[in-house]
Amino acid sequence: MIILKKLKILLISWLLLPINVFAYSNYIIPGGETLGIEVNSKGVMVIGFYQINGKFNKGVPVIKAGDYIVKINDVEVNTIEELTKAIEANVSLGEVNVELRRDKKVRTSKLELVKDGDIYKTGLYVKNSITGTGTLTYIDPETKIFGALGHEIVESNTNNIVEVKDGSIFRNYITGIDKSKVGYAGSKNAKFYYNTKYGSINKNTNVGIYGIYDSILPNKERLEVARNDEVKIGKASIATVLSKEDIKYYDIEITKIDEYTKVKNISFKITDKELLDKTGGVVQGMSGSPIIQNGKIIGAVTHVIIDNPTTGYGLFITTMLEEGEK
């Protein structure tokens, strides 16, 4: 009987041991490359409405900006082309049944097809893809999982996070910089090379975009992943592109560390004169730039502070690596 009690205690102690369920590598390939990014939505996004002959479509009270149209008369649609084809096939009916997704719940509505001259209109503004520029944060050389951006991709009209069906990262060439100033976030201006694809996107989250790097891995020195408690106030650097495809390292100063928030763990200010002269501070397109300290990769740039664009936020690299593995 005594032996059984001891065994029970031993089993309980085993269950209490912490288990690391994430399998990311301890050494990863740092990014810094500017990327072209294109994501396609799960369904067709409704982004707004317009009047036809002075009034809105009668289906509009049910349909909201930010909804995803997923079916027309039970036919699945994921692109504007598929949506148009499904509607055109039912023009003679004068209306269609629309299946919508909102907050992961399915809703239905009837949508009148209104004739205006020689064409039929729905009164809906829609889109199914978004393209932009961001920065690669890392590639895990063992799994080929990549992380980039450090924050979510949102649809600009609704400000909603895009529910991604699939997407791509591809070659991007910086042609100039629109400088930041107080009250205004500048941006990287870029040329897109859609035919030079680097990887496939399968996830869009509030801590970055993730997927599989399909191309040949960059020939770079792998950097050790820093634990959160290794990140210190003081000097660090970011890797990013300001011209063409040339990755350079620029000095920053980490001013505050917050371990208890998810997306703004690292507060920093730019101290590099060259970077400040060329950009005025943090600019759009810089999101995802890896942050390096003491030879280790510690995080990624995520946000600019508009009131003082020489300052910004970053998140811990471990947060991105864990999200990439989920």
Tell what function each PLM region has.
Residues 60-81, 291-293, 298-299:
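Conserved PDZ fold ligand-binding element
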Residues 35, 84-123:
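PDZ-domain C-terminal substructure recognizer with occasional recognition of PDZ-binding tails
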Residues 42, 65-66, 232, 287, ...:
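Short, flexible surface segments
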Residues 115-280, 284, 293-294, 302, ...:
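Serine endopeptidase catalytic core focused on the charge-relay Asp
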Residues 31-65, 267:
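PDZ/PDZ-like groove recognition
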Residues 75-86, 247-249, 307-311:
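Short, Lys/Arg- and Gly-enriched loop/turn segments at beta-strand edges
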Residues 56-68, 89-91, 281-285, 290:
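A short glycine-leucine-enriched loop at secondary-structure breakpoints
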Residues 2-23:
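Sec-dependent N-terminal signal peptides of Gram-positive bacterial secreted proteins and lipoproteins
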